[in-house]
Design a protein with these regions (language model features):
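Extracytoplasmic/peripheral linker and loop segments enriched in polar/acidic and small residues
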Residues: 38, 131-142, 169-236, 256
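Structural transition elements
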Residues: 34, 62-96, 113-116
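Ligand/substrate-recognition segments at binding pockets and active sites
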Residues: 61, 95-160, 181, 202, ...
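Periplasmic-binding protein-like
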Residues: 13-26, 30, 34-72, 116-117, 174-190, ...
């Protein structure tokens, strides 16, 4: 994006839009290697999101605070675990966990941005004594990993609609082992997901979805990374039809 800005093709426009995708690191709560919440919290504290933004996204994307994008009901201004790595906190949590010689595997869809992100996480966790193996998958095998009870860490990316109900729907208890790969099960979260659908008070609804994301982080099973970004380059001879999140609607494009 920065290169394009500096050398934009003649007679063209670069437009940048927020994205409805969300990227995170998940931890399988049913795996015995990740049962210790202090270990999971140490992993959360050790991951440095700004480094990922610089190396994987070339500073074209911003760190996220949860699964709900900015501008939508339920978006949080801050996450509970922070954006920058806190190695002092992470090392303290590791000591409190009593764990040593920890070795984990992070499963990743084989795309360059994901591989770079996984390598940064690998380096981050090495700083607190956790060895990480990057396990690359093609799409056919990656999207079946939710059924794998031995899954450890996973770098994942989902999309959502402008209504936050769609975002939380994948993390309820009944989705464990389907789309809820962390196998996160929380009765309060499930109730929020159900009740927020019919909540007409927008302030209350906003608070409910913020609380839902707090619960996800408090479980130690999630480290939120980014919503990514959606840049578009188009010729000035056309009038593009773009959704608010930047996704093109080609059938509605027309000549200027």
């Amino acid at each position: 994006v920065e290169r394009l800005k500096a050398n934009l093709p003649a007679n063209s426009t670069l437009a940048e839009f927020p994205s409805l995708f969300y990227v995170w690191v998940g931890m399988n709560l049913d795996n015995p290697k990740l049962k210790n919440i202090k270990l999971r919290q140490a992993i959360q504290a050790a991951i440095d999101v700004p480094s990922i933004m610089a190396a994987s996204y070339f500073v074209a994307a911003e760190p996220s605070t949860g699964i709900i994008a900015p501008g939508l009901s339920g978006h949080r201004d801050q996450s509970l675990t922070g954006i920058e790595a806190n190695l002092e906190k992470a090392k303290k949590l590791m000591a409190e966990s009593g764990e040593s010689n920890v070795s984990l595997k992070i499963s990743v869809l084989n795309k360059s941005v994901n591989v770079t992100t996984a390598q940064i996480i690998q380096a981050n966790l090495a700083a607190i004594g956790v060895t990480v193996e990057v396990d690359l998958h093609e799409g056919a095998t990656f999207w079946g990993l939710g059924e794998d009870k031995t899954l450890e860490l996973v770098l994942n990316r989902y999309s959502m609609t402008p209504d936050p109900y769609y975002a939380t729907s994948w993390f309820i208890t009944e989705q464990a082992g389907v789309w809820n790969w962390e196998r996160f099960a929380n009765a309060e979260f499930d109730k929020i997901h159900k009740d927020a659908q019919s909540e007409s008070d927008l302030v209350k609804r906003d608070a409910m979805y913020q609380r839902a994301q707090d619960l996800m982080e408090e479980s130690g099973a999630y480290k939120f990374i980014t919503h990514e970004a959606t840049p578009n380059v188009y010729r000035n001879t056309i009038v593009p039809a773009l959704r608010p999140d930047g996704m093109p609607l080609y059938r509605y494009f027309k000549k200027d």
